[in-house]
Amino acid sequence: MLDNVLRIATRQSPLALWQAHYVKDALMATHPGLTVELVPMVTRGDVILDTPLAKVGGKGLFVKELEIALLEKRADIAVHSMKDVPVAFPDGLGLVTICEREDPRDAFVSNKYHSLDDLPAGSIVGTSSLRRQCQLAERRPDLIIRSLRGNVGTRLGKLDNGDYDAIILAVAGLKRLGLESRIRTALPPDVSLPAVGQGAVGIECRLDDARTQALLAPLNHSQTALRVTAERAMNTRLEGGCQVPIGSYAEIINGEIWLRALVGAPDGSVMVRGERRGSPEQAEQMGISLAEELLENGARAILTEVYNGETPA
C-alpha cells in the first residue's frame, strides 16, 4: 500500500458500494489519519445479465477483476459479499478478515402476497439462485420459477413491472440499501437454508502485505469468522461453485456450533440434508465431515448431474 493510503477495489453496484463504504468507515474510525480510497470496477458478472449465472461461470464472475487489481497492486484490498466468494483464491491472495454478519436469511418480496404459502398455484417467482430454486420447488412444486438477474434495484423493478408475482432476495442486501420495507417475510432457515457466508462481508488482500493485514485485523468478527469457516469448509469439500444448489448455515448456540447443510436437485425432486454440532475449534472439520456425509447420501450424484447440465431422475 502507498504511504498512509489504502485503496479498496469494489464493484459499482449500490450494494457493493455500500459494503466498500462500510469497510472504509470502519477502517477510518479504527485508524484516524488513514486515507481510504475506493477503486470502482466493472466485473463480467455486472455485464452479462441476460444469462443465468449457472451457465456463465457462477458468481466468481463478480470477483475476478477485483483480484487482478490486487495482484497488479492497483488496489490493496477487495471487499466481497461472502456468498459471492469462490472456494479457491489466486496464488498470493487470501481472505484475511470477515466482518460481523448481518441477517443471513432469504427474503420473500411481493406486492400482492404476504408469504410464500399465500402464493396461488401457477404464480411466477423470480430468483437467479439454484439453491433458492431447489428449496422453492420442493416446498411449492406448483409454482413457476424463472431466472432473475441484475442488481437489487433492477430485480425490484421487474417485480414492480408485473413480470413476477414474487421474488426471493437476501434480507441483508435489502436492509443495507434501506429497503427493509420491501420484505414481506424473512424465510427461516428450515424453509430456505441460506447460502454459504450469506450476510457476511469479507476482505481479501495480498498475503505478503503484512501492513494491510494489521490494519484489517480489528475489523474481524471472530464468531462470524467461525461460522463462515464451517460453512466454507463444507462447500470446499463439496467442490461447490457458487452456481450450484448448496445451502449451508452455521449458528453458535450456547458456545456450540450448529451447522446445517443441503444439496438439492434444481427441480426440488431430490434433497440431501444433514447437520453437525460441535465445539468452535472443530468448525473446519465439522464442515468437511458433513460434506462427506452429504456426498455419500446422494449429493455426489446431484452435483455431477448439475455440472453436466442434467437434472437427476
Curated annotation (Swiss-Prot):
Its EC number is 2.5.1.61. GO terms for biological process: heme biosynthetic process; protoporphyrinogen IX biosynthetic process. InterPro entries: HemC, Porphobilin_deaminase_cofac_BS, Porphobilin_deaminase_N, Porphobilinogen_deaminase_C, Porphobilinogen_deaminase_C_sf. One of its GO terms (molecular function) is hydroxymethylbilane synthase activity. It comes from the Bacteria. It is an enzyme of class 2 (transferase). The porphobilinogen subunits are added to the dipyrromethane group. This is Porphobilinogen deaminase. It comes from Salmonella typhimurium (strain LT2 / SGSC1412 / ATCC 700720).
